[in-house]
């Protein structure tokens, strides 16, 4: 009996990633017997195998589970789900739905462009079609360069909003392509405009996808996450291609039917994109999320967790905040005299200078050479608090008194309010920062829009603020 018990007792165990562990015991003949326990999401199984036996052998449900295992290794990053962010699966599912709808819409648009170029028309000129194609491509290339220069530095700050904007712009571009053959005189201009929009989509969509991939990769596995995302998109596009082969012959001769299909697919595309972007839970603060978290903190004394703040973050209106907050501006934009400089630095030793224009609701911040991420976060918090003084809503006692001063005082005494809020922040900000860290926010980095200007001034602190 003792020998039998010792044979059945596990000698060792092994585990792959987050899967269920399996144990090993000694067989009667002295060989090792492994309990095969594997978990594929909601699937699990256990059986006995000896060294040299193929774990994927056999038919029936085990073969099906082996197929699922193969698909998992092909389409999902290694170590899933531990190697990616918690929002990965929900985001990728909705992203696949939108990619499928976009693939079908793209097929309708491509067919319309080819018809407009004269494919299938014996009277069409090859040189005219070539000229149209060259004009279309050159317009898009110029647009790509200009947009990357104009908005490239802002894409990280509002990745979710720009991702949604890119997909809506892509739908608009495809609509123009579908309508282009109806107006042959304006065909070249229409398809050029469409390609310009698509090139902007390529810049905005590609850049924001890279930013989101950085968020999803939790084991420095950005390349693996990106590669598997590309594989998923390829599978979806292949499915879209097969469906398009069945759909196009049915709608090619009827413009109204093509438009009807396009409208339905566009509605699905936008909805799936919204759900995908809304599923994201980013743990870094941009201006919108910081404003939401700060407002909740001032009103209730609690810091919102990333999941709650991301659900409340505006996706459609994030481009037009009520307060104009500029971080990292040149010092000469803030002061023009020695007296103004003394007013700004009086009463505080923080490595930033802040100027508030009440009439325009504009806050400009000059940063010191020693300003680090937490300094930038404090400066942004300072600016948002000044903006809150011009709004309604509950505020802590000291800030409520300052709001009364704002409503009663002259607009040209803003520097006094800036100095007073510095003193309030000396007590308030450490509590706020500690609450952010406890709630799960990453305060060692941020996605606030900061320009490259830095300055020094007489009362700048010597100690570097991290």
Swiss-Prot record:
How does the protein associate with the membrane? Answer: Single-pass membrane protein
Question: Per the UniProt record, which residue ranges are transmembrane?
Answer: 245-265
State the compartments where it is located.
Membrane
Q: What's the superkingdom here?
A: Eukaryota
Alphabetic keyword roster: Acetylation, Membrane, Transmembrane, Transmembrane helix
Where is the PTM N-acetylalanine found along the chain? Answer: 2
Q: In which broad location class does this protein mainly occur, judging by the first location in its UniProt entry? A: membrane
One matching Pfam family: UVB_sens_prot
Keyword Isomerase in the entry? The reply is: no
Q: Which GO terms describe its cellular component?
A: membrane
- Write down the InterPro entries for this protein, in alphabetical order: RUS_fam (IPR006968), UVB_sens_C (IPR055412), UVB_sens_RUS_dom (IPR054549)
Instruction: Check the record and name the PANTHER family matching this protein.
Output: RUS FAMILY MEMBER 1 (PTHR12770:SF31), RUS1 FAMILY PROTEIN C16ORF58 (PTHR12770)
Family per UniProt?
Belongs to the RUS1 family.
| Protein name as it appears in the record | RUS family member 1
Q: Which gene encodes it?
A: Rusf1
